[in-house]
C-alpha cells in the first residue's frame, strides 16, 4: 500500500525549512548506508547530532502526530526521528531496500522499519531528475511530489532516487514501526477505517457504523503488537 499524504507543511513552513537547510552543514550520505547500499548511494545528509536537524526533526514529529491520514495508514507504534537529505550535481540512490532495524540516536531504543516515508521539501520545478521510483507488486511507480507532500510506502520494497541533474532536491525521510507488522493486514484496516468514516459522515446513527467500528477494533486487537 502506497499513500500520498498532502499538506504536511504549510507554504510558510516550507520556506523556513528551505532557508534553514540552505545554511546547514551537509555530510556525505554514504556514512549512514549499509555495506551493500553504500555502493548505490550518492547524496548528502545532515548528521544525527546536527542541532538544526534535531530542531526540524522535532517539529516534524509533532506535526505527524496530528495528521489523521498518516496515523490511519501507518498505525504508528514508534517513529524514527526524521532525517534530511540533499541531492545535487548528479546525486542519486540506486535500487535498494532499507535496513530492517534502526537505532534511535541517544535513546538506546531500536525500531523495526515497517514503513518508509519521504517528505518533499523542494518544488518539482526547482530540480531535474530526482524521481522516487518504488517497485510495486505489479509495476514500478514514479513520484516527484509538490513540496509539502509525503509518500508513505512499505520499507520492504525496492526503490531508488534518479540522478538530479539540475538544482537541488531537499527532503525529509524517516521510518515507522507499525502496530500491525503485516502490510496486507494494515491495508485492510485502512480500507475498513475509510469505509467507517464515509458511512458515519452520511448517517452516523446507522447500526452498521457501530458494528464495523467494533470489527475494526477487534481486528486491531487481534493483529497489533505493542
From Swiss-Prot:
Question: Is Chaperone one of the keywords UniProt gives this record?
Answer: no
Ordered alphabetically, the record's keywords are: Dioxygenase, Iron, Metal-binding, Oxidoreductase, Vitamin C
Q: How is the cofactor bound?
A: Binds 1 Fe(2+) ion per subunit.
Query: What Pfam family is a match, any one?
Result: PKHD_C
Please name the GO terms that the record assigns under molecular function: 2-oxoglutarate-dependent dioxygenase activity; iron ion binding; L-ascorbic acid binding
Cofactor requirements of the protein: Fe(2+); L-ascorbate
- Give the GO biological process terms: DNA damage response; intracellular iron ion homeostasis
Q: Where Fe cation is bound, by residue?
A: 96, 98, 159
Its recorded name reads PKHD-type hydroxylase Nwi_0701
Per the UniProt record, the source organism is Nitrobacter winogradskyi (strain ATCC 25391 / DSM 10237 / CIP 104748 / NCIMB 11846 / Nb-255)
Amino acid at each position: 500500500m502506497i499513500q500520498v499524504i498532502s499538506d504536511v507543511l504549510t507554504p510558510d513552513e516550507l520556506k523556513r525549512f528551505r532557508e534553514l537547510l540552505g545554511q546547514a552543514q551537509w555530510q556525505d550520505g554514504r556514512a549512514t548506508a549499509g555495506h551493500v547500499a553504500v555502493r548505490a548511494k550518492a547524496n548528502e545528509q545532515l548528521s544525527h547530532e546536527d542541532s538544526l536537524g534535531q530542531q526540524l526533526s522535532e517539529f516534524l514529529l509533532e506535526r505527524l502526530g496530528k495528521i489523521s491520514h498518516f496515523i490511519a495508514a501507518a498505525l504508528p507504534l514508534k517513529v524514527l526521528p526524521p532525517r534530511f537529505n540533499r541531492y545535487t550535481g548528479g546525486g542519486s540512490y540506486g535500487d535498494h531496500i532499507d535496513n530492517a532495524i534502526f537505532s534511535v540516536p541517544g535513546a538506546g531504543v531500536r525500531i523495526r522499519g515497517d514503513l518508509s516515508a519521504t517528505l518533499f521539501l523542494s518544488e518539482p520545478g526547482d530540480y531535474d531528475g530526482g524521481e522516487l521510483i518504488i517497485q510495486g507488486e505489479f509495476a514500478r511507480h514514479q513520484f516527484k511530489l509538490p513540496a509539502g507532500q509525503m509518500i508513505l510506502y512499505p520499507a520492504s520494497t525496492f526503490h531508488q532516487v534518479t540522478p538530479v541533474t539540475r538544482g537541488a532536491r531537499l527532503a525529509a525521510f524517516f521510518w515507522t514501526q507499525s502496530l500491525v507488522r503485516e502490510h496486507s493486514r494494515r491495508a485492510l484496516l485502512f480500507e475498513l477505517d475509510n469505509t467507517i468514516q464515509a458511512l458515519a459522515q452520511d448517517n452516523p446513527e446507522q447500526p452498521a457504523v457501530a458494528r464495523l467500528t467494533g470489527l475494526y477494533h477487534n481486528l486491531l486487537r487481534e493483529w497489533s503488537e505493542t
